[in-house]
């Protein structure tokens, strides 16, 4: 039997890792420039965290979670998203008693039992940010500005930002009743999933991708028209702040997001140039989440970006400008008798900040030189009888084909003078 990676998962091989490292660095640098700090939470949590936090009626909880019982019969779940674990960490460690807002970012794998397709996997990776402790609309704007800034630094300027308000608990309850009244006569025309969502959270019907459901509920009341005065003012200030910072957006009445914890500001970012699966990230405000999980009444807002989708977009839009790091030096040992000296030299080069390697396959000197060419190393250092006896090293520039005999310190300074100007 051939052992393969499970369906919906994949390996990130060395030639691809450089792409990941590139976008990860841009994301980290961007978040830290906005005052966010890194947090790492467990890959699995108690199942109840997601049932309470994400919502029992969501597709994630009802269909997509990887849950299992441990040996003590406790139900655990591989994390399907990153916000609820961050809220749990905030509560568990009492971090809300310090300076607010708390601003965190995270990066790592998530897990959902979904139908694998282009840009969508069962183990996937997200970069996300969370800010707890402020309900300022200007913090909402800052979070969105950070999202846009990451895309800009990646060269993805042709984006569409979709924006909506999902109101507070007061105006949402009022709207929920009006939406139920509108949908009720057509509930038999809804898809099976929406018939189940209908009573649990009718807003989820608006998020359905089935055309039959769109047709059945057409003419539904618009949430924006039912916002309370506070939520109207909050949303207006978010819009004004985005406009003042040159961020264009589309007000999208259909945008409700797929998780139950969202309130007030909600947003998604799309890259129209990559086809039907154009959404690469999104987020919003979740002012009731911390309290729902047993903590104090602390507001929060955040977003998550799908890293596989971003990499797909960079490839499709011709924005991939990645090159695998090459060696600076390959050390060629001309005779087995000098393996120890070769190993000492290669490790001294590494300690001095030079990317270096040597052969461990017993190749001849000629074969090692040929192999060094395949590694794309800029320099070769030859270690042989003459070099060891006379205490110098032979340095060869693989581009110019020039060759010198140098003492060790002169060798290192010569190599560094070239690689530091790359």
From Swiss-Prot:
SUPFAM superfamilies: Class II aaRS ABD-related (SSF52954), Class II aaRS and biotin synthetases (SSF55681). PROSITE patterns: AA_TRNA_LIGASE_II. One of its GO terms (molecular function) is histidine-tRNA ligase activity. Keywords: Aminoacyl-tRNA synthetase, ATP-binding, Cytoplasm, Ligase, Nucleotide-binding, Protein biosynthesis. It comes from the Bacteria. GO terms for cellular component: cytoplasm. Its EC number is 6.1.1.21. Coiled coil: none annotated. Homodimer. This is Histidine--tRNA ligase.
